[in-house]
C-alpha cells in the first residue's frame, strides 16, 4: 500500500515502514585468548632455549685453549680466546645476552598468566631486538676470526692455524654454531612479540 492512498472509508492511509535493527553485538571468540596463551608459552620456552645457546657458547669459548709442545725445551705454542680481542668481545656479548634472557624470564611468566599485557611485552620486544643486534654483531666478528683460523689469508700472508690447533678450532667453531642458533631464537622471540602486539592492537 503506497503513501497517500485512500482506503474504502475515504480516509488516507499512513505509510508503514519496517524497522531495521542492527545485528546483535557478539562477544569475541574465546579462541583469541587461547592463541595469546600459546604465543606466551612459546615465548617462555624459546627463552630457555636461547639461554642454553648463549651460555653454552660463552662457556665453550671462554674455556678453550690448546698448547703445542715444541722440539726445543721450555718452548711452547699456546692458543687461547683471550689472545684475540674479537673473541673476548664475543664472550662478553654472549654473557650479557644470557644474563638478560635470565632476567627476562619473570616477565615472560607474567605474560603466560596475563596474555593480554601490552606495555611489558612491548618493552621486552624492544630489548630482545637490542640483544639480537649485540649477539649478531659479536658472532659475525668472531666468525671472521674463525674463518681466518681455518683458511688463513693469502693476500695478507696469514697462515691458518687449525691444522696445528685442531681442538681449539673445533671448540670455537662449535661456540659460533650455538651463538647463531641463539640469534635465530631471538628473531623468533621478536616475531612472537610483534604478533602478540598486533593481535591486541
UniProtKB/Swiss-Prot annotation:
Localisation: Cell membrane
Residues on Cytoplasmic side: 1-34, 108-128, 193-201
Keywords in alphabetical order: Cell membrane, Cell wall biogenesis/degradation, Membrane, Transmembrane, Transmembrane helix
Extracellular side: 56-86, 150-171
Region (Disordered): 1-26
Its membrane topology: Multi-pass membrane protein
Lipoprotein found in the keyword field: no
GO CC annotation terms, alphabetical: plasma membrane
Pfam families: CASP_dom (PF04535)
Compositionally biased region (Acidic residues): 1-11
S-S bonds: none
Signal peptide: none
Keyword Cell wall biogenesis/degradation: yes
Regions crossing the membrane: 35-55, 87-107, 129-149, 172-192
Domain of life: Eukaryota
Gene Ontology annotations of biological process type: cell wall organization
Family: Belongs to the Casparian strip membrane proteins (CASP) family.
Summary of the function given for this chain in its UniProt record: Regulates membrane-cell wall junctions and localized cell wall deposition. Required for establishment of the Casparian strip membrane domain (CSD) and the subsequent formation of Casparian strips, a cell wall modification of the root endodermis that determines an apoplastic barrier between the intraorganismal apoplasm and the extraorganismal apoplasm and prevents lateral diffusion.
Subunit structure: Homodimer and heterodimers.
Name of the protein in its database record: Casparian strip membrane protein 5
Organism: Oryza sativa subsp. indica (Rice)
